[in-house]
Each structure stands twice: as C-alpha cells, then as structure tokens.
C-alpha cells in the first residue's frame, strides 16, 4: 500500500506498507515472499521515474536492513525481514530515490527496534526486536531533519501494538 499527500508547503509525504512476506524466505516456495520482493521492485521503479524532492517517506517497510536493526544479525540472516535479498531490494529503493534514513542519521550505532513479537512473553527482558518502521527524507531536505526517537515504552502499555511510534523532527 502506498498513500502520498502533497502538503500546502510543498512537502510530499509518502506512507508505505510493505507486505510482511510470510515465514519462508524463498520466492519459489512462498508466494507472499515473492509478492514482497515484487512490491519493493515496483517501489524502486516508481522512485526512478519520480525522483523525490522535498519528500518524506514513512511506514512499516517490514525490513530491518542493518545488523543494529535486529537483536542478533547472524540468527536473523535467514529470517524474513532481515534476509540479504530483502536488504538488497530495500537498498535499491533507497538508492532510486536518493533517500536518507533519518533515524539512522540521528542514531547511527546502537541497537534500535520498533517492533517486538507478540509471541515473546517477556518482550522487554528478551529484547528480541527489529527496526521495521522507517522515516526517510529526500536528500534535498535531509539536513533539515533531526531529533529521531522511538517510543519503546509504548510496547509496554496495556493491549499495545507490536509496533511502537517512530518520530523525527523536520524543520522546513
């Protein structure tokens, strides 16, 4: 799903939901994984044809691209959301739009998650999260962004989502 809005100040907001991709990271065995990769290819093609200017991209991209975006890079390397093929597809989208990962621009080195499984009984102690939710800015406005934060504590609320809010400040 892709929803875009042009604001009165000339900023375009793109909100994406990238399909989760099922449980098996194999295009031939898992139609959902194939659909996810095809969707990412369509995103890439869209941004090659429509170069983003004065744009923000937000959403659940269902990919944790960096080793610091998952609780254990080696254990997660064959798990949907952190496989190399997904990471490569997401990087191609990022290159196509010349997007800057605002959250990682602000918080470059530490483990950072926006999602924890409902299956984890003690999600906070085990801390087996993933950073699936992203905020990107087009290169022309990326320097106007900052103050990124992820509200981890929201995951501990009564009846929470498995995702938590991700914020950034954009001064334009």
Could you tell me what each predicted segment is?
Residues 1-172:
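Active-site regions of metal-assisted phosphoester/phosphodiester hydrolases
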